[in-house]
Amino acid sequence: MKKILKNVQPSIRAYLGLACCYSIIDEQAFTSGWVYDKYIHLEYTSYDSQIKYADYEHYDFVSAQGVFAKSFIEYPYDFCSETILCEYICKMLDEGEYCFALWNETIITNYLYEKQNPGIYEHGCFVYGYDKDKKVFYTQGYFDNENWEHAQIPFEIFYEALSYCPEKGEIALIGYREIPDYEWESNIPKICLLYTSDA
């Protein structure tokens, strides 16, 4: 069984904790210019043909605009087996929820690039799909050399990366579900007020 949630293509390369949301919001927000005009600053690097960075004018994009329904769950570490965790993430994806969490990205880059780097690099991860037959999660991010990549991470490696710190006592997962039929509206009076107050 396989489930892959939509991603706007090309993906907007940005800081994972929040801006990966740009990969999953309604395409209308982009085609209308609303997101680019209001929130994103992009930097294109010609040497590798990538849109490498996105940032916010307003940091509260996700919470303030009502674009997403957000969920949060913490699993007690002692009861959080690979099977339980991976099944729960698959269930989130089945219900249309994208998964965000913290992992030890050193484990991921060691797996992807056959390296043996030591240490912990705590970083956000973004999961948008799975394949139970292959036992992999689909993810994307800056994994190596500042290049944005899509990757398939085996359940076993994924669990190892998420369970890197038993001292925390739990493994936390954040889910984002796009609100259906969200209407992107410009608040023209508010925009005019902002411009006239700066003059």
Regions found by a protein language model. Name each.
Residues 2-181:
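Conserved active-site-adjacent core of cysteine acyl-enzyme catalytic domains
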Residues 195-199:
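Conserved small/polar residues in nucleotide/adenosyl-binding loops
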Residues 183-191:
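Non-catalytic accessory segments flanking enzymatic or RNA/DNA-binding domains
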